Amino acid sequence: SPTGFMHLGNLYGALVDERLAHQSKGVFYLRIEDTDRKREVEGGVQMIIDAFKSFGLPFDEGATTDGETGIYGPYRQSQRAEIYQTFVKSLVQRGMAYPCFCTEEELSAAHEQQEKNKENFGYYGKYAVWRDRPMEDIEAELAKGTPYVVRFRSEGSIEHKIRHEDLVKGKMEVTENDQDVVILKSDGIPTYHFAHVVDDHLMGTTVVVRGEEWLATLPVHLQLFRAMGWKAPKYAHTAQLMKIDPETGGKRKLSKRKDPELALTFYAQEGYPVPAVLEYLMTLLNSNFE
């Protein structure tokens, strides 16, 4: 994501991607996930390319400074809107997705009610008020030009578990997703969930490496892959980078505000050789990697 701050966690994940790809004669590619326009910064793509290049992680294909290289483009999600919209339309036609015209105020009111009732937060069950609305209501809102998002119609239940084998965490059980998540925002751009599924299928992604903080989204992604009739890639959820807090003595996540060593620029400024940084990260990932 071109948000302007390249940190050690980015390099940590990319290092696994690169090694897995090249050790298996695969492809290490750069896809720019720029669907969150509010957080995007000018020159963000260049920062990503420069940062990884400085640590000896060149991309085989994908987005470049002045375009792209490879046969699976566009590699910028902001340029793939029509692709996503085509697949969303297919889900709507099959009754697996629907438009939702809820306002922010209505969603906030539902959230407050859920909090009051000590219920799970989100858009599901009786709170999914547009899930089964008659076509006349939908057509009336469309005629008025009311903004809407498109939601996936989940058939999951939190009473059920999914068995899954993660490449890092091994065999595990996760709770099914029962939320009717947004897959297309009101500006016609997909959410991360849907863009990830479509792109990983079309680009032939076989392994997705990401931090364990994304583990909670796994049921949504597996559900979307099944709905599309596609084989899901393998997932590897890596542990988050931690440090011992000098003040409390306890473990905590690295922080932009507190820890200058989180920024990739820190290591060149302090004179750390690139091989030493990579060796450190590889040892964290697998203590006997040699």
What name fits each language-model region?
Residues 38, 74-77, 210-211, 266-271:
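Hydrophobic alpha-helical scaffolding
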